[in-house]
């Protein structure tokens, strides 16, 4: 069962009475396309924007089933070029539905003039207005339009019609990380596999914080797999941004042989929000208490994610929401035996230490609360991890691709037939809406085409 983010009434938890929870509906949103960028040093990206780094392609893997090569992409100060939108709904042909949520759906589409496959996220304006989710769509576009990172899904086009908002994104043919875990023995990874993906997620969170954003909804359902097996974060509608972000600080290295690190905490220092958002099993204690939260919630969710990757379940899951919240508030994390086939292995002391420090109940004492990602990356658990070269290493999960472009979507669950199919051919782009901004709550949603170096 895929877990959905919600905003329940948490005050009743502290008042010791049954909470009045809103009804839940199943929600899933997936975003995708073919060619991701390669990983380069975040320190050089931020502190020396004139420096370009390019890495060679990930080699093809042997075997009967074909795995697709990635192309070379260069990072530089002009690696994203924004132009007036050059496409519309009728520029694409729907292939199949990949996922759906309460306000929209995600389709695999093919661009007519290039035959390239993309993931098209289509959001209903009517449903967003009805559910008060307009700001979420605007926040997601802001993050996607300004992000350029190998572990964050790439946006190529965004536009709107009279009734819908459109995001045309990277099609990650490896599918949903949640599904990949569910299909593994024990629904989990060994320690080295969990460490690898934890490192990639940490790098992505570091970049988001550097840009002034708090993710706030990290979970396996919001992570996609590129065809090479590397992760791609998606679904940023619950993210919160600081505009402009604070300036990054510098953390001196503990050894003269090591380079300094970036203090990303200073980029989001002024960002504190009281919104009750997140996914039940991943919500941090300070969110439940309703006392406001900061970027520390992202490090809490990282701790929950690492635990789930290792044990196939979350550490504080209860029989119901109220019990789960109570355990989050008052229970200390316990480490059971790993499921088969890893039951004879014991989690290392550094692994337990990392999870305990990430799941500290006090956000001010939690790992990452001082210097952000620099604190997490310097933990002994990641001692042998070269974060700058993650994109060159072989991931623990290698998705099998039957067809080179992934058009058969073998790594996605089969969706039921649509009751009302969206007709892309008859939906026209709204070219100009500025004259009607008083009556159009989506006036700030930008129609744009983004070009990336190497495309």
Regions found by a protein language model. Give the residues of each.
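Activation segment signature within eukaryotic-like protein kinase domains
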Residues: 197-198
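Eukaryotic Ser/Thr kinase distal regulatory-tail detector
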Residues: 272-275, 279, 284, 288, ...
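A conserved loop-to-beta-strand element in the N-lobe of protein kinase catalytic cores
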Residues: 153, 162-170, 178-179
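A short, aromatic-enriched beta-strand patch in the conserved N-lobe beta-sheet
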Residues: 157-158
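Conserved N-lobe ATP-binding subsite of Hanks-type protein kinase domains
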Residues: 105
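Conserved N-lobe beta3->alphaC-helix segment of eukaryotic protein kinase catalytic domains
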Residues: 117, 122-148
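Intrinsically disordered, low-complexity regulatory segments that flank or precede the catalytic domain
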Residues: 1-89
């Amino acid at each position: 069962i895929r877990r959905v983010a919600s905003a329940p009434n948490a005050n009743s938890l502290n008042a010791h009475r049954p909470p009045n929870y809103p009804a839940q509906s199943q929600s899933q949103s997936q975003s995708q396309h073919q060619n991701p960028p390669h990983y380069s040093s975040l320190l050089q990206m931020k502190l020396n924007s004139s420096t370009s780094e390019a890495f060679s392609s990930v080699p093809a893997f042997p075997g009967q089933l074909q795995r697709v090569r990635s192309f070379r992409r260069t990072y530089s100060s002009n690696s994203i070029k924004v132009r007036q939108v050059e496409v519309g709904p009728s520029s694409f042909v729907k292939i199949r539905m990949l996922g759906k949520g309460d306000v929209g759906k995600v389709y695999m589409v093919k661009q007519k003039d290039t035959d390239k496959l993309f993931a098209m996220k289509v959001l209903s304006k009517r449903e967003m207005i009805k559910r008060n989710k307009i700001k979420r769509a605007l926040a997601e576009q802001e993050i996607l339009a300004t992000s350029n990172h190998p572990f964050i899904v790439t946006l190529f086009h965004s536009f709107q019609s009279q009734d819908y908002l459109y995001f045309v994104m990277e099609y990650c043919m490896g599918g949903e990380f949640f599904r990949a875990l569910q299909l593994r023995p024990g629904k989990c990874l060994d320690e080295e596999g969990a460490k690898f993906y934890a490192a990639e997620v940490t790098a992505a969170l570091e970049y988001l914080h550097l840009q002034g954003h708090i993710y706030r909804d990290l979970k396996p359902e919001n992570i996609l797999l590129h065809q090479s097996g590397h992760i791609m974060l998606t679904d940023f509608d619950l993210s919160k941004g600081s505009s402009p972000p604070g300036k990054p600080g510098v953390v001196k290295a503990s050894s003269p042989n090591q380079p300094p690190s970036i203090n990303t905490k200073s980029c989001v220092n002024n960002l504190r929000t009281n919104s009750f958002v997140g996914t039940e099993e991943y919500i941090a204690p300070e969110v439940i208490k309703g006392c406001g939260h900061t970027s520390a919630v992202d490090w809490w969710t990282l701790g929950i994610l690492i635990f789930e990757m290792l044990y196939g379940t979350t550490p504080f899951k209860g029989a119901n929401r109220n019990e789960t919240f109570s355990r989050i508030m008052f229970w200390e994390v316990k480490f059971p035996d790993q499921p088969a086939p890893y039951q004879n292995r014991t989690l290392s002391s550094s692994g337990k230490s990392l999870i305990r420090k990430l799941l500290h109940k006090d956000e001010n004492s939690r790992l990452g609360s001082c210097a952000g990602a620099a604190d997490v990356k310097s933990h002994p658990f990641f001692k042998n991890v070269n974060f700058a070269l993650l994109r060159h290493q072989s991931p623990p999960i290698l998705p099998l691709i039957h067809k080179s472009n992934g058009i058969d979507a073998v790594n996605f669950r089969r969706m039921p037939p649509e009751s009302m199919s969206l007709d892309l051919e008859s939906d026209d782009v709204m070219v100009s809406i500025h004259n009607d901004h008083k009556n159009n709550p989506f006036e700030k949603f930008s129609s744009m085409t983004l070009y990336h170096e190497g495309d």
